[in-house]
Amino acid sequence: MTLSLVLFLIGILGFILNRKNIILMIISIEIMLLAVTLLVLVSSYQFDDIMGQTYSIYIIAIAGAESAIGLGILVAYYRLRGNISLRT
């Protein structure tokens, strides 16, 4: 559980400190989602419950869809502006 908390805090710090680069913001959000998934899996294992493992599969699927949508928006943003920096 400590590992998932550390990963979540790294994701929050990465999101806050890298406000200029969209790719690093998306990666930070993914780290936060995977930290939550790890916490759900560990809790599911400790309580001997299969629903947590099923829920973690849904979280991973949503994280993949979120990454695909975010990268699609990033490509459109690059075509419109010519760079991916937020502050220009």
From Swiss-Prot:
Chief localization class?
mitochondrion
Q: What is its EC number?
A: 7.1.1.2
Q: How does it sit in the membrane?
A: Multi-pass membrane protein
What are the protein's UniProt keywords?
Electron transport, Membrane, Mitochondrion, NAD, Respiratory chain, Translocase, Transmembrane, Transmembrane helix, Transport, Ubiquinone
- Where is it localised? Mitochondrion membrane
> Keyword Metal-binding on this protein?
no
Q: One Pfam family this chain carries?
A: Oxidored_q2
> One GO CC annotation, please?
mitochondrial membrane
Q: Which NCBIfam families match?
A: PRK05715.1-2
Q: What is this protein called?
A: NADH-ubiquinone oxidoreductase chain 4L
What organism, scientifically named, is this protein from? Trimorphomyces papilionaceus
The gene name reads: ND4L
